[in-house]
């Protein structure tokens, strides 16, 4: 369920995926921390199937194997049902580059090329946020730290300041939709809660 798409300077397609809501696993409710919202790179290598909807990415679960691990969605009909082993085989499923927190609902992605912000050529994601967790999360614009093509971690640039992007007392009154870079390296993001466009600046 890829939503935000971006073609980089090497003509490779990056995407951010919105995972499903109300997720259970063999009857156990795991929706608060799962599925992780995926960052995918379509570069012509490996499997052409990226897992949705037969498989999902772990973000945080009891007895889990780590963020980004693929699991089979046990709620599917028997004809569509896969196994965990099948989902983890890269010959079947192209693994994600990174798994962001569940229910962030990322909608926009861009690779920063400018110099106005001290973020190198990292990826920047605009996330709309979601209702489907006990503590609503994800109204953020986040930086995805990279090492080559690998994403190693995320950092909230603007929005809810909790490490999980959770809404806090006096919650931020915006819901990011997309993020774009202007020719001069300025970064802007749109907000459909207030019908606004914000400019991101760096204060030293």
Placement of each model-derived feature along the sequence:
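Beta-propeller domain segments
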Residues: 1-170, 174, 203
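Conserved interaction-surface patches within small, structured recognition/assembly domains
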Residues: 176-178
């Amino acid at each position: 369920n890829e939503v935000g798409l971006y073609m980089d300077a090497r003509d490779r397609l990056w995407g951010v995926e919105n995972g499903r809501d109300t997720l259970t696993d063999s009857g156990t409710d795991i929706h608060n921390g799962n599925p992780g919202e995926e960052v995918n790179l379509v570069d012509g290598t490996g499997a052409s199937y990226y897992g949705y909807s037969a498989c999902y990415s772990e973000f945080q679960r009891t007895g889990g194997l780590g963020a980004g691990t693929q699991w089979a969605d046990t709620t599917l009909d028997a004809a569509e049902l896969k196994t965990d082993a099948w989902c983890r085989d890269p010959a079947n499923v192209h693994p994600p580059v990174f798994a962001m927190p569940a229910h962030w609902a990322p909608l926009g992605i861009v690779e920063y090329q400018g110099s106005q912000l001290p973020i190198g050529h990292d990826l920047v994601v605009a996330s709309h946020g979601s209702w489907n967790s006990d503590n609503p999360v994800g109204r953020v614009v986040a930086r995805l730290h990279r090492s080559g093509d690998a994403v190693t971690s995320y950092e909230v640039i603007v929005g809810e300041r909790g490490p999980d992007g959770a809404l806090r007392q006096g919650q931020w009154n915006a819901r990011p939709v997309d993020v774009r870079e202007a020719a001069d390296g300025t970064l802007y993001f749109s907000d459909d809660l207030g019908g606004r466009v914000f400019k991101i600046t760096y204060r030293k």
